[in-house]
Each structure stands twice: as structure tokens, then as C-alpha cells.
Amino acid sequence: MPIGVPKVPFRLPGEEDAVWVDIYNRLYRERLLFLGQRVDDEIANQLIGIMMYLNGEDDSKEMFMYINSPGGSVVAGIAVFDAMQYVGPDVTTICMGMAASMGSFILMGGEMTKRIALPHARVMIHQPASSYYDGQAGECLMEAEEVLKLRDCIAKVYMNRTGQPGWVIYRDMDRDIFMSALEAKSYGIVDLVGEDPTATPSVWFRWPSLLDSKDSNEK
């Protein structure tokens, strides 16, 4: 039987009594974002809205985006990527489980030197596929041309952010390429593997701030 989204206590600044909020809203207050599903317009708009709010609240305090996604909509993924580049704070990306297709594109969009994969994470890249239309015959050519433009756009971003030459990116995008965390680091999609001793400890040990007593919430 599903248990729904867990709720945790949260004490608003200046309040004596805690209220129960869903765990993701609590974590958002700590600037921890989660992409744990297929990339679609709904989750993209949620993530973009949260990033814009946090950017307005403090445009210098780092955000952390945890990713476990099989990919999804190309346009929605590009929107999240662009929002990550737009906001003032660094966005650290952390891959847990799988970052495939647009999931890997968003992973790669984190702040350079702050893109991380956990030791057993998997990363996959391939060329974009899209469907704007409902199969109308007269629109097929139009869609094919748009997909080619998106493919070139995504390939250029991969080239710029991984350091790989264009021929390697286009070759690898022609098929599904799966990588381990270490292979993704060698490829340039991530900068650190979770067990790497150079990984910043603060990325992993922000949890005490979630459990702080009344004093921390009232500062």
C-alpha cells in the first residue's frame, strides 16, 4: 500500500510550534532539489520555479540538484539546463542511480568542477528524439528538421562542457552509450565521483542543518 510523500516537522522562523510539511518542501528550504522521474513539462516548471525563487531569496548561496532520471522531453530538459545557467548561485549536480538522455544533459549542466556521480551511478547519452505533433503526415518533415536542430544544439553543449571533439559527440549520440561513474568522469560529463577524496564534504554532510533545533530555524 503506497504511503504517499513522507512528512517531516518544520519550525518556521519566529514560531514556537513546528508544522508538518512534505519532505521535498522541507528539503527545498535547504536548497536541495530533486529530479527523480522522467523529465516533462510539469517537473521542469517546478524545478525552474524553485530555482528562480531561491535565486531571488539569495543569489549567492549554492543549490544542489540530485538526479535519478531516465530522461524525457528534450525541450523541458533544455529549459531546466538554461535555468541552471541563468541563476546566480552555483548549481551542484549529483547523479544517484541513473542519469540518462536529458537526465545526463541536466547533470552536465551543473557548475563546472561541481558535477558529481555517486560510485554506482550510470550515465547514458544518445541523440534527442522529440514529438511535438500527433503524427500528422504533413508535419513530419517539419518535426524532423526541428529534431536535427535540437541535435546540433545539444551536441554543441556537450562539446563545450565535456571538452570532447565534435566527431566523438556525434558518433556517440548515434547510439545509446552507457557509462559508469568513472567513465562519465573521463568523458567530462561529471568532474568528481562520490568516493573521490577531493569531493567537497559539504555536499554530502548538509543533513545536520535539516535536523537542527529551534535555534537554527529562528536565526
Curated annotation (Swiss-Prot):
Subcellular location, record wording: Plastid, Chloroplast stroma
Catalytic activity: Hydrolysis of proteins to small peptides in the presence of ATP and magnesium. alpha-casein is the usual test substrate. In the absence of ATP, only oligopeptides shorter than five residues are hydrolyzed (such as succinyl-Leu-Tyr-|-NHMec, and Leu-Tyr-Leu-|-Tyr-Trp, in which cleavage of the -Tyr-|-Leu- and -Tyr-|-Trp bonds also occurs)
Enzyme class: hydrolase
Any single biological process term in GO: protein quality control for misfolded or incompletely synthesized proteins
One MF annotation (Gene Ontology) recorded for this entry: serine-type endopeptidase activity
InterPro entries attached to this UniProt entry: ClpP, ClpP/crotonase-like_dom_sf, ClpP/TepA, ClpP_His_AS, ClpP_Ser_AS
Keywords: Chloroplast, Hydrolase, Plastid, Protease, Serine protease
Enzyme Commission code: 3.4.21.92
Positions annotated as active site in the UniProt record: S101 (nucleophile), H126
GO CC terms in record: chloroplast stroma; endopeptidase Clp complex
Main location: plastid
Family affiliation: Belongs to the peptidase S14 family.
Function noted in UniProt: Cleaves peptides in various proteins in a process that requires ATP hydrolysis. Has a chymotrypsin-like activity. Plays a major role in the degradation of misfolded proteins.
Assembly behavior: Component of the chloroplastic Clp protease core complex.
Protein name (record): ATP-dependent Clp protease proteolytic subunit
Native source species: Chara vulgaris
